[in-house]
Structure formats: C-alpha cells, structure tokens
Regions:
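Non-catalytic terminal accessory/regulatory regions of metabolic enzymes
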Residues: 1-92
Length: 92
C-alpha cells in the first residue's frame, strides 16, 4: 500500500476508534504493565485503539466527512463496545 499523502484532488480523513471507557481493555493493561517493567513509572494507564486513514477523492468537506462517519459506524467500529471520532486534518 502506498503512503497516504496530500495530492491534488485527494484528501485524507482520519477515523480513531477506542473501546468505550466502561469496556475492559486487557491489551492496554498489558502495555501499561510492560511500561512499569521497563522503567516508565510515570505511565499510569494505557487504552489501546485503532486509527484509520481514509483517502478520498476531492476535498474533505462536511458531506464527505459525514459519509466517512457513516462508514465508521457501519464497518470500522463496533458501536456496542467502541466509540469513534472522525476528522479531516489540514493539509501540510
């Protein structure tokens, strides 16, 4: 897969998916425990999640971001146990 980059007529929309706060996160707990073992004592907790970078044609206006939000709700996140956010970063 080629790296996502800003090009003429192409935009990127970012979807971040996290477990809901009330859902147990064993992977995050394992990472936090490893941080302690490795000497990173300032780390109190970790929640693990997923990040999707979706490349779309054209600008990432409100309508396009709304379509990606619908995609996230239907395909990228499990609404029973996960919450998500969608945003279009500013091009560099």
């Amino acid at each position: 897969m080629r790296a996502l980059a800003y090009a003429a007529g192409v935009a990127k929309v970012v979807v971040e998916v996290m477990l809901k706060p009330e859902i147990h996160d064993p992977q995050g707990e394992a990472i936090a425990a490893a941080c302690q073992r490795l000497g990173f004592g300032q780390v109190l907790g970790v929640r693990q999640g997923k990040r999707f970078e979706v490349e779309i044609s054209g600008p990432a206006g409100a309508g396009e971001v709304g379509q990606i939000r619908a995609l996230a709700a239907e395909l990228l996140a499990n609404p029973v146990i996960e919450e998500f956010s969608v945003h279009a970063p500013e091009p560099p």
